[in-house]
Structures are given as C-alpha cells and as structure tokens.
Design a protein with these regions (language model features):
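Transmembrane and membrane-interface helices of multi-pass
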Residues: 2-5, 11-248
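Short extracytoplasmic/periplasmic juxtamembrane "stem" segments immediately C-terminal to an N-terminal membrane anchor
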Residues: 243-260
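Cytosolic juxtamembrane regulatory segments of multi-pass membrane proteins
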Residues: 169-176, 255-263
Length: 266
C-alpha cells in the first residue's frame, strides 16, 4: 500500500550529495541567516517574531535535507496551492489582502499567477522549474515593491521599469530596512521554493516523438499568451484611467480654488 510520505528509494547521505545539492543547501542556509540577521539588526530583539522566523527556516531546511518522496496526489495538491501562496506572500508584504482588496481583484490576480505558472510549465515541462521562476520572480517583485512604498508611499507601476537606472543612482541616499513580517514572508518564499523541489511533476509524454510534444507545448503557450495579454492590457488601462481621473479631479479642485480666490471681496 502506498503512503503519502515515504523515504526515497535512492536515499543518499549528505556526503553523497551532488555539488548542486550542496551548493543549494548552503545558499538557502545563508539566505535564511541573512533574513534573521537583518530582522534583528533593524528591529531589535523580539522573541515571538524571532521564533517564528527561526521555525520557518528550520522546517524549510529539514524538508531540504530529508530524502523524502511525496505521493503524486500530494505533489499535485502542493503544486496547485503554491501559486496562491506566492500571491498572498507578495501582497502581505505591504498590506492585509482581505482588508484592502476586493474578492474580484484577488481572483483576477490569481488568474494571472496561474497563467504565469502554466506558461513556464508548458515551456519547461517541469513544475519545479515553473514554480521556481514564479516564486523567485514574485519574491523579488514583492521586496522591490516594499522598498518603493517605503521610500515614496506608492507601489511599483509598469512605467517604473523605464527609470531603473535613475533609481539605482539615488539608492545610496536611502536606508534599506525590513520588518520582522517582511523577513518572515521572505523566508516563506524560500520555504516554498524548497517545497517545490520536492513535488516536481514532469509533463506527460503525449507522443513518442519529441517534435510533436514540442509543438503541443508551443500551442499551449500561445493559448496562454492571449489571456495574459488581455490581463496586462486591462491592468495598464485601468491604472491609466485612475491616474487620469485623479489628475482631472486635482485640476478641477485647483480651478475652483482659483475662482474662489478671485471672487473674494477685498
């Protein structure tokens, strides 16, 4: 009888790890240490927050070290959950999702996350590669968005990509600091990346010929590009309409104030 969690048949000791496994172990260990160190340095000693951060790091590293093999059903469930986890980890860096976002906005964002995941899954044929790309990308965007809001009190906008060079030149004028929450969420991203490596699902062999499999993957990618393009177009158009509305409102208020000033008797 199959169990949902059991030891891998090709169990290896730590000394028999490949160079990539050893490098990954020390990279993750260093990243967790950086999260803990920066959180303590910028916020002082807080035992409850520190224990949560250490617990996330320990559980993640234990998952990395243990030679476990998950049941295919468990792999599928975790794979389905991780894009949603990436969304909530990213958004929680700057606000409480359910207090600041409507349910339709949450669902629309989740659709984009799953399209992102499926696109790279069909390209690579591996859920591990696709989830790694999604999680690393969202972690970087989340941290960048956190620092942008910290400095100018507004989130990252699409046209901010055009001013990356300017931002890099003035970065030395700001102090980069993180809260315990941001450190915990970053550690959560790292834990999700480790977990994704334990539940890799390969693209099924749809044909004996690689050419046909490649064409099918390409067709699926093209199908996913269409809704993704509509999503990006909708997001940018909505942002532009909001900015235009705010600008028009400010101009109208300015005109009204000027008219009131001219009409005041002296």
């Amino acid at each position: 009888m199959k169990t949902f969690l059991h030891s891998s048949k090709d169990k290896q000791s730590l000394s028999n790890w490949s160079l990539r496994q050893k490098a990954g172990f020390f990279v993750f260990l260093a990243l967790f240490a950086i999260c803990i160190g920066m959180a303590c340095f910028f916020n002082g000693f807080s035992l409850p927050n520190l224990l949560i951060l250490i617990a996330i790091a320990i559980v993640s590293m234990v998952i990395y070290v243990l030679p476990i093999s998950l049941h295919p059903v468990v792999k599928a469930v975790i794979t389905i959950i991780l894009p949603t986890a990436a969304f909530f980890l990213l958004e929680s860096m700057t606000h409480v999702v359910w207090e600041t976002m409507e349910i339709d906005a949450v669902l629309l964002n989740l659709v984009f996350y799953y399209l992102f995941f499926l696109f790279f899954f069909f390209v690579s044929g591996s859920t591990k590669i696709s989830l790694d790309i999604l999680l690393i990308f969202t972690m970087i965007v989340g941290l960048a968005n956190y620092f942008v809001i910290l400095f100018r009190s507004s989130p990252i906008l699409p046209w901010d990509l055009l001013s990356v060079g300017t931002a890099a030149t003035v970065a030395n004028n700001y102090t980069f600091s993180i809260t315990y929450l941001v450190a915990q969420l970053t550690a959560g991203f790292l834990g999700c990346i480790i977990l994704a490596g334990k539940c890799n699902i390969h693209f099924p062999a749809l044909s004996a010929k690689k050419t046909i499999r490649g064409l099918i993957r390409l067709a699926l990618c093209c199908v996913l590009i269409i809704p993704s393009a509509f999503y990006v177009h909708f997001y940018i158009s909505l942002t532009l309409r909001i900015i235009q509305a705010l600008t028009t409102r400010c101009l109208l208020q300015n005109i009204c104030l000027r008219q009131m000033a001219f009409s005041l008797p002296f």
